[in-house]
């Protein structure tokens, strides 16, 4: 192939609508994290969008250098499209063909690249466009793909579904996608914004039990009294009755009962989900956290005597067993090791606690995760190991992290209380005076930053330009 032809082919590739041009890895810390999120979504979306998942897995295989495996995933996607969308097979296959072209390009098989570029061109030319067309089905496919990736892709997924609905406002699939994206983006503060799309999606998809549980979760989070609270419970019960073996329904229903402070019901549902996917790290993690909630329930009851202690240790044992299975299945899971460490500390197993704290410190953590770890380890040093100086050190390290969070405020409060307690015993305590000076300096810096931000907003200097909104 001549250089001109190769350049022309590369130009055509860049115009294709597919995973290789959607920038799906943007903002990801690593390929492992990205893969983990995708597999997390894969295992629970176990009935629908199988072709979408095959395309996404093909992209992941390519990123890992497994191009032959990627091609096998794409072949499977083609088969599924023929089964699921026989009447729209050409339009629905455009993304898959684009992925084929890119994989073959990276394999150096340019003649095969040309075959798939031509297949895309043949379909697009029917709509007076060479290599890409505006199609609600393509927008929908991109939307589901971005939803599977989660995180910072949810906002873009919502835009895709909104765009698709402009052309087909009553389409059940597009409406479901918009509802799920709205649910994910409406975390805090809870508002009516996700309720209406969910209700509309359920009207158009009355057999989609997963949507019903999402609506129940949103209603519960709104904390509305009376009818809507009862409506949420009814929705979950109906979903479980009609879809008793669907893992995404089971898991989301378990979340509903956890939020209602009913850990036993949540554990029952999560264990049922484990029957279908027994080695899933996330399910074991959630079961462990439910047992941890039961630990705190027993501690709050302040049961005395041997029975209370025995019950506490039994619950800690169940929590630890499931959390260890989660850690063994996926040692990158967020917070698992620090939770394990805290549970071992409650059971007076300090060597095990120290081991898991240090394992968590060895990981690459987000700012908030680092703050939480410093808070938990500081508490361990303060209350179990009776080492106030180490506790102070970790609370200070956590507060130094430039991230607003509840954990940061808790550590500031603890430092304040420790310093005041020490000064009440010794007014010249240098460590306590140092802590108070540190907190005073920190508060002054934060106040100055807030004032600078307000001045910037008033002057308009922080308002983004039109080009920034367009991603330029």
UniProtKB/Swiss-Prot annotation:
Induction cue: By type I interferons, dsRNAs and viruses.
PROSITE patterns, A to Z: TPR, TPR_REGION
Main localization of the protein described in the UniProt heading: cytoplasm
TPR repeat residues: 51-89, 90-135, 136-171, 172-208, 247-280, 281-335, 336-366, 367-405, 406-448
The keyword DNA repair belongs to this UniProt entry's keyword annotation: no
GO molecular function: RNA binding
PTM sites of type N-acetylserine: 2
Polar residues biased stretches: 462-472
Organism domain of life: Eukaryota
Keyword vocabulary terms for this entry: Acetylation, Antiviral defense, Apoptosis, Cytoplasm, Endoplasmic reticulum, Immunity, Innate immunity, Repeat, RNA-binding, TPR repeat
Compartment(s) where it occurs, according to its Swiss-Prot or TrEMBL record: Cytoplasm; Endoplasmic reticulum
Pfam families: TPR_8
A GO cellular component entry from the record: cytoplasm
A single GO BP: negative regulation of protein binding
Region annotation Disordered: where it falls in the sequence: 446-472
Function per UniProt: IFN-induced antiviral protein which inhibits expression of viral messenger RNAs lacking 2'-O-methylation of the 5' cap. The ribose 2'-O-methylation would provide a molecular signature to distinguish between self and non-self mRNAs by the host during viral infection. Viruses evolved several ways to evade this restriction system such as encoding their own 2'-O-methylase for their mRNAs or by stealing host cap containing the 2'-O-methylation (cap snatching mechanism). Binds AU-rich viral RNAs, with or without 5' triphosphorylation, RNA-binding is required for antiviral activity.
Family: Belongs to the IFIT family.
Domain remarks: The C-terminal part folds into a super-helical structure and has an extensively positively-charged nucleotide-binding channel on its inner surface.
Self-association state and partner proteins as the record states: Domain-swapped homodimer. Component of an interferon-dependent multiprotein complex, at least composed of IFIT1, IFIT2 and IFIT3. Interacts with IFIT1 and IFIT3. Interacts with STING1/MITA and disrupts its interaction with MAVS or TBK1. Interacts with EIF3E and EIF3C.
Protein name, entry field: Interferon-induced protein with tetratricopeptide repeats 2
Organism annotation: Homo sapiens (Human)
Gene: IFIT2
């Amino acid at each position: 192939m001549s250089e001109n032809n190769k350049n022309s082919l590369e130009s055509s590739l860049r115009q294709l609508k597919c995973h290789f041009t959607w920038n799906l890895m943007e903002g990801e810390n690593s390929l492992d994290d990205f893969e983990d999120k995708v597999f997390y979504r894969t295992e629970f979306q176990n009935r629908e969008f199988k072709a979408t998942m095959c395309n996404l897995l093909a992209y992941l295989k390519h990123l890992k250098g497994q191009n032959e495996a990627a091609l096998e995933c794409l072949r499977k996607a083609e088969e599924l499209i023929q089964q699921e969308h026989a009447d729209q097979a050409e339009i629905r296959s455009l993304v898959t063909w684009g992925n084929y072209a890119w994989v073959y390009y990276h394999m150096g098989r340019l003649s095969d690249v040309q075959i798939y570029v031509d297949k895309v061109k043949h379909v697009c030319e029917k709509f007076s466009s060479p290599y890409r067309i505006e199609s609600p089905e393509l927008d929908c496919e991109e939307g589901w793909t971005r939803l599977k990736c989660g995180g910072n892709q949810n906002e873009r997924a919502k835009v895709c579904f909104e765009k698709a609905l402009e052309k087909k406002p009553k389409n059940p699939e597009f409406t479901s996608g918009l509802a799920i994206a709205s649910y994910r983006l409406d975390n805090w503060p809870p508002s009516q914004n996700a309720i209406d799309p969910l209700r509309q999606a359920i009207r158009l998809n009355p057999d989609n039990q997963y949507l019903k549980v999402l609506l129940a979760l949103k209603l519960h989070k709104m904390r509305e009294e009376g009818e809507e609270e009862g409506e949420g419970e009814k929705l979950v019960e109906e979903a479980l009755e009609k879809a008793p073996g669907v893992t995404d329904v089971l898991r989301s229903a378990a979340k509903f009962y956890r939020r209602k402070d009913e850990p036993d019901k949540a554990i029952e549902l999560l264990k049922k989900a484990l029957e279908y996917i027994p080695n899933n790290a996330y399910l074991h993690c959630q079961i462990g956290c439910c047992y941890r909630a039961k630990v705190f329930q027993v501690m709050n009851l302040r049961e005395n005597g041997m029975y209370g202690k025995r019950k506490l240790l039994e619950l800690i044992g169940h929590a630890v067993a499931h959390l260890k299975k989660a850690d063994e299945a996926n040692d990158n899971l967020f917070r698992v090791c620090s939770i394990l460490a805290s549970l071992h500390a409650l059971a007076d197993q300090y060597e095990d606690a120290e081991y898991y704290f240090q394992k968590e410190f060895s990981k690459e953590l987000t700012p908030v995760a680092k703050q939480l770890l410093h808070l938990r380890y500081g508490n361990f040093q303060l209350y179990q190991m009776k080492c106030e100086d180490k506790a102070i050190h970790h609370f200070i390290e956590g507060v130094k992290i430039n991230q607003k969070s509840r954990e940061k405020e808790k550590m500031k409060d603890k430092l304040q209380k420790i310093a005041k307690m020490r000064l009440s015993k010794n007014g010249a305590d240098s460590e306590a005076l140092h802590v108070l000076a540190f907190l005073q300096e920190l508060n002054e810096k934060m106040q100055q930053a807030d004032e600078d931000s307000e001045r910037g907003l008033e002057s308009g200097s922080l308002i983004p330009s039109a080009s920034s909104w367009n991603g330029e």
